[in-house]
């Protein structure tokens, strides 16, 4: 487990004060890697073509015929096209069972080379279709099964079938290639190297049936998927115009997979983000962030969240496209997963220059942000804490005062009791910077009184005895730097300046913005 920085080093990292927003955002991206790895990807890597046997039209022709595995092996290798077709179809049906399909059994029987050969039977499109379907389902299995399909030489014949005049054959080839590409970057790049992308793009048109277009969008998303390495720049440039076109399609599954594709392409360096942003997709993505369909909202929000991890210019383009008109609303979404993504996106906006922070204030993001700090699920609260942390490290004194006036202190102080040492240290750093900002306008004592009145001083003092050395030192630093006056001095100050406008305004703000403290969190 990596060790935490020494207090001085950690504080130095937080002392950007708006001078290096790019470095601050990169620090946030590095920390968010843990969050990214923990996220469950809602999009399927592979899909098996399952058929309800009772609804399969081919059953009417083969009713009563049930071939054994040995008969299938013999038939698939037969020279008689009709016998070969029946055996290949029987193999496909076995592989299309909803439960426990014998994928490995078929592979171990050595049928893949013959199935690949049958893909080239241009005079028998029904046979091509059944062979492609069987290979699709084998490739939907574990990586070793997908590898068997690739090693068996299936990619190039499948790519050639993308030009088949028979739509069912062509669509099944698209599906098979999608499963192969979805296995990982190695096979994805094999598919790309076989010139699959230009063939796929010729299929994208307004006349294509929607179910077919769904398969194309999903396969393209798998060609955009995976890092280490990313897909090549050339491949990305080929796909982006088609993705831009698909982003305007009304079908929700097409939209979902297209948004996922864009989320994969933006989950990387600034140059990758720039390629996507330059296509002009941002206005449409912002529009889709208001979708009531979770399978569209999630990847569109993820994509925008990725974009604002980029350069200040890229973030500016996202702001100009209207993301701040949607993100505050998403903090109140009924799904915590959406709240978390929205807070993460806001944290990266807050990691930018002060003009970005000002736009965050102007859009009304602070009240819902404070609300999730108070009452959100812990995973959402953590992202909200990061937003506040980035805000305080880059914001001006005036902006920090607005943050305090929004009621941020009470929930932050309440979170000092959470069993997450990293978060506690970040919150302590936030309080440190707020006190520093107050000191710059000669209002530190008032801020100290406000923190004390909210129970903050007691909690910070208690943290000096925390078992975690970093937490204890950070708390001690705040006490020594900002709360070291004698009690008599503080008491005299309170009596003398009870009606001080600054303290009065903040106190009134807290009366208006805060609610009774919630009970202990589970």
UniProtKB/Swiss-Prot annotation:
Keywords, in A-Z order: Nucleus, Protein transport, Repeat, Transport
GO biological process, alphabetically ordered: NLS-bearing protein import into nucleus
Pfam families: Arm, Arm_3, IBB
GO cellular-component term (any): cytoplasm
Transmembrane intervals: none
Superkingdom of source: Eukaryota
Domain IBB: residue ranges: 1-57
Localization terms from the record: Nucleus
Record-linked InterPro entries: ARM-like, ARM-type_fold, Arm_3, Armadillo, Importin-a_IBB, Importin-a_IBB_sf, Importin_alpha, PBS_lyase_HEAT
Family note: Belongs to the importin alpha family.
Function (record text): Functions in nuclear protein import.
Quaternary structure note: Binds to importin subunit beta-1/KPNB1 via the IBB domain; this complex dissociates in the presence of RAN-GTP. Shows a limited binding to the RB1 nuclear localization signal (NLS), but not to the SV40, nor NPM1 NLSs. Interacts with RSL1D1. Binds to the NPM2 nuclear localization signal.
Protein name: Importin subunit alpha-8
The species this protein was found in: Bos taurus
Gene from which the chain derives: KPNA7
């Amino acid at each position: 487990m990596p060790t935490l920085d020494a207090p001085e080093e950690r504080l130095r990292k937080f002392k950007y004060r708006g001078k290096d927003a790019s470095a601050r955002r990169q620090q946030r991206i590095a920390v968010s890697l843990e969050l990214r790895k923990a996220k469950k990807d809602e999009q399927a890597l592979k899909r098996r073509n399952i058929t309800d046997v009772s609804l399969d039209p081919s059953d009417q022709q083969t009713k009563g015929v049930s071939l054994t595995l040995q008969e299938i092996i013999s038939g698939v290798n037969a020279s008689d096209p009709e016998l070969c077709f029946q055996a290949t179809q029987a193999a496909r049906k076995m592989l299309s069972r909803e439960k426990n399909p014998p994928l490995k059994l078929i592979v171990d029987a050595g049928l893949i080379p013959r199935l690949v050969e049958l893909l080239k039977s241009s005079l028998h499109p029904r046979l091509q279709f059944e062979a492609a379907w069987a290979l699709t389902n084998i490739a939907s299995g574990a990586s070793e099964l997908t590898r068997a399909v690739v090693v068996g030489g299936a990619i190039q014949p499948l790519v050639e079938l993308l030009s088949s005049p028979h739509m069912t054959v062509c669509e099944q080839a698209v599906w098979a290639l999608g499963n192969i590409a979805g296995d990982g970057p190695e096979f994805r790049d094999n598919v790309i190297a076989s010139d699959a992308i230009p063939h796929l793009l010729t299929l994208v048109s307004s006349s294509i049936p929607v179910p077919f277009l769904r398969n194309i969008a999903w396969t393209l998303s798998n060609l955009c998927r995976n890092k280490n390495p990313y897909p090549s720049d050339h491949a990305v440039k080929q796909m982006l115009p088609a993705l831009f076109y698909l982003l305007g399609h009304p079908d929700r599954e097409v939209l979902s997979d297209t948004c996922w594709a864009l989320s994969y392409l933006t989950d990387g360096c600034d140059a990758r983000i720039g390629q996507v942003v330059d296509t002009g997709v941002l206005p449409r993505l912002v529009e889709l962030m208001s979708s009531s369909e979770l399978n569209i909202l999630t990847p569109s929000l993820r994509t925008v969240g990725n974009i604002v991890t980029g350069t200040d210019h890229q973030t500016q383009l996202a702001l100009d496209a209207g993301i701040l008109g949607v993100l505050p609303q998403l903090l109140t979404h009924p799904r915590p997963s959406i709240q978390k993504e929205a807070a993460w996106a806001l944290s990266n906006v807050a990691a930018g220059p002060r003009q970005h922070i000002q736009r965050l204030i102007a859009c009304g993001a602070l009240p819902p942000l404070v609300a999730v700090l108070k009452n959100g699920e812990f995973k959402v609260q953590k992202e909200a804490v990061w937003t506040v942390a980035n805000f305080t490290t880059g914001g001006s004194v005036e902006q920090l005062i607005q943050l305090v006036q929004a009621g941020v202190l009470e929930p932050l102080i309440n979170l000092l009791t959470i069993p997450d040492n990293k978060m506690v240290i970040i919150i302590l750093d936030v309080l440190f910077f707020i006190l520093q900002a107050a000191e710059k306008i000669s209002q530190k004592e008032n801020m100290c009184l406000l923190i004390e009145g909210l129970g903050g001083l007691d909690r910070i003092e208690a943290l000096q005895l925390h078992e975690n050395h970093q937490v204890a030192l950070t708390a001690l630093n705040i006490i020594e730097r900002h709360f070291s006056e004698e009690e008599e001095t503080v008491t005299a100050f309170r009596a003398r300046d009870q009606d001080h406008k600054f303290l009065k305004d903040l106190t009134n703000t807290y009366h208006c913005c805060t609610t009774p403290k919630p009970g202990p969190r589970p």
